[in-house]
Amino acid sequence: MNNKEKGDFGEKVAVNYLLSKGAKILEKNYRLKIGEIDIIAKMEDEIIFVEVKSRSNIKFGYPCESVSFKKRKKIIGVASYYIIKNNLNNTPIRFDVIEVYLLEKRINHIMNAF
């Protein structure tokens, strides 16, 4: 499995996980020139912007460690555009990271990651 396939698989796992928790998926791979958000979901009255990180092992660190300051800044920029475009200015939001551990077949959901 190449990195793209691992990422796509991890995103499917994350979507299914969020659905099982009662979330509604609003967008997948929401892209602008400045960046991308893997999943935008709604749970109750809150909009959740989710970055998914998949790993076969932790040889190069935990998945969440790869969400750098620069990456967070891009995600926040894309989220800001989404909020304005969809008139969600008064809606509570949060930024989550979902780590998918492929070999262990488990996930770790970090709510309010940044």
UniProtKB/Swiss-Prot annotation:
Protein name as annotated: UPF0102 protein CD630_12710
Intrachain S-S bonds: none
Entries under SUPFAM superfamilies matching the protein: Restriction endonuclease-like (SSF52980)
Taxon lineage: Bacteria, Bacillati, Bacillota, Clostridia, Peptostreptococcales
PANTHER family hit by this protein: UPF0102 PROTEIN YRAN
Domain of life of the native organism: Bacteria
Organism: Clostridioides difficile (strain 630) (Peptoclostridium difficile)
Pfam short name (any one): UPF0102
Family: Belongs to the UPF0102 family.
InterPro entries in the record: Restrct_endonuc-II-like (IPR011335), tRNA_endonuc-like_dom_sf (IPR011856), UPF0102_YraN-like (IPR003509)
Single GO MF descriptor: nucleic acid binding
